[in-house]
């Protein structure tokens, strides 16, 4: 049994460093447009070259009390599970609570202690299988990224791929949980790599989403995305959905 530092302990953590809490609509993937509270944790175990999310401050969180106002209070970190429950319940009729980051699975101990009135929607890089095991019965939605990293970005590529597959196996779609995958596609994304990984996880997901990268200079040609979609359709229901929240300037 693996007993490394990222092996989950069995007790819940009562606090965590959170970079922001806000209310918006889900801007990515098949649930685009549903109203959500977003809880963005600090810290990440990866450094994706295209990442659009700055590393959050550890000292304080920013909390948008009125949705869309652009006005933030700055509660001190760490925040408790009770603080989070109070903040997200203030947002009214939400569909779910998006747990994002950074990498939320680095805070699995805290997530396992959350008791919220709304279902949990996990947004993860799917590379920490021990943490995934710990929270698998807490989350109702899993938006799992497939990270096709260049060899220079990982010490052990086989282990990275195994960890990804193990996360999807653990958090797979069931009667009580939806699980789908997103792949951020850039002009450097190799179709063979995408197809290999999607083939390996197809049995665990309800659909796959090809998400064009937001930086214009990194975008592939439209024909490339359509060709990739056609290949993926051999394995799983596949949609091309760009990030929508950036179109209308919401968080
Ligand atoms: C900021 S990440 C946080 C959650 C987790 N670490 C992950 O990567 O899934 C949230 C989502 O934004 C996507 N994303 C980040 N930068 C992007 C970009 N430049 N263009 C399109 N999607 C991007 C990620 O791939 C992921 O699906
Ligand atoms: N509106 C909106 N939708 C999102 N879906 C995933 C996001 C993320 O950064 O995890 C995100 C985000 O930051 N904003
Ligand atoms: S895993 Fe997610 S948060 Fe971390 S660097 Fe990649 S896109 Fe950004
Ligand atoms: Mg985002």
Sequence positions of predicted segments:
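Short, basic/aromatic-enriched C-terminal tail that caps enzymatic domains
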Residues: 2-22, 236-251
